[in-house]
């Protein structure tokens, strides 16, 4: 199993608004992000996650989608997976359906890895779906267990007061970074074993 300790800190946000679009317009869908897209078909959408999720969920009605994020892309803080999870959740909400955290995480992984063919891990999608401080066990078959860690507000504030976060301005592609990490795993077994022990001692 792969173990990791994750804390989804409520510092930065991505805001998604999804509405059904009246059927009176020539363009069926309008997506506002870095670009403003107005298209007739899902296949014409440039935003890869929006296109993949709408196709995956077989969206029939026209949509207006507005996205605003506190972070630029490719910061390494999980903003892409947060968007995927949030957009899936919004699509279910438009259907009047509730989705479980497990389902959101699994579908986000499927969209990013199987549909978009990105070489990414699964921790970010799980962290975005569950939120909070968790011990995540990822099994060889791809299934996972999430164990929330309950700590007092005093201990939580103490932990956060000892963390520092810096923006370097360096953009990186998560898929490329993951590919490089996978190649180096055979030579890093001792370090990875030690890191796994740290998760055990922390939880």
Predicted regions and their residues:
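Short, small-residue-biased leader/transition segments that mark boundaries at the very start
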Residues: 1-9
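Short alpha-helical patches at coil-to-helix transitions and adjacent helical residues
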Residues: 2, 47, 81-85, 129
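C-terminal nucleotide
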Residues: 6, 13-59, 68, 91-94, ...
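Residues at or immediately flanking beta-strands
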Residues: 62-64
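Helix-to-disorder regulatory junctions
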Residues: 66-67, 80
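DPxDG-like acidic metal-binding loop motif
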Residues: 77-97
């Amino acid at each position: 199993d792969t173990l990791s300790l994750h804390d989804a800190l409520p510092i930065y946000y991505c805001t998604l608004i999804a509405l059904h679009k009246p059927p009176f317009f020539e363009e069926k869908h309008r997506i506002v992000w870095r670009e403003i897209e107005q298209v007739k078909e899902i296949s014409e959408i440039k935003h890869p996650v929006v296109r993949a999720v709408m196709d995956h969920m077989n969206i029939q009605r026209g949509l207006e989608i507005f996205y605003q994020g506190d972070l630029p892309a490719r910061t390494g803080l999980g903003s892409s997976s947060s968007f995927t999870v949030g957009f899936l959740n919004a699509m279910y909400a438009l259907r009047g359906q509730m989705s479980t955290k497990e389902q959101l995480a699994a579908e986000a992984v499927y969209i990013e890895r199987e549909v978009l063919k990105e070489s990414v891990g699964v921790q970010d999608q799980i962290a975005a779906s569950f939120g909070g401080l968790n011990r995540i066990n990822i099994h060889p078959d791809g299934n996972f267990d999430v164990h929330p860690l309950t700590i007092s507000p005093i201990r939580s504030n103490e932990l956060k007061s000892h963390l520092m976060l810096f923006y370097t301005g360096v953009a990186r592609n998560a898929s490329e970074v993951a590919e490089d990490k996978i190649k180096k795993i055979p030579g890093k077994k001792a370090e990875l074993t030690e890191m796994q022990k740290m998760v055990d001692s922390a939880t």
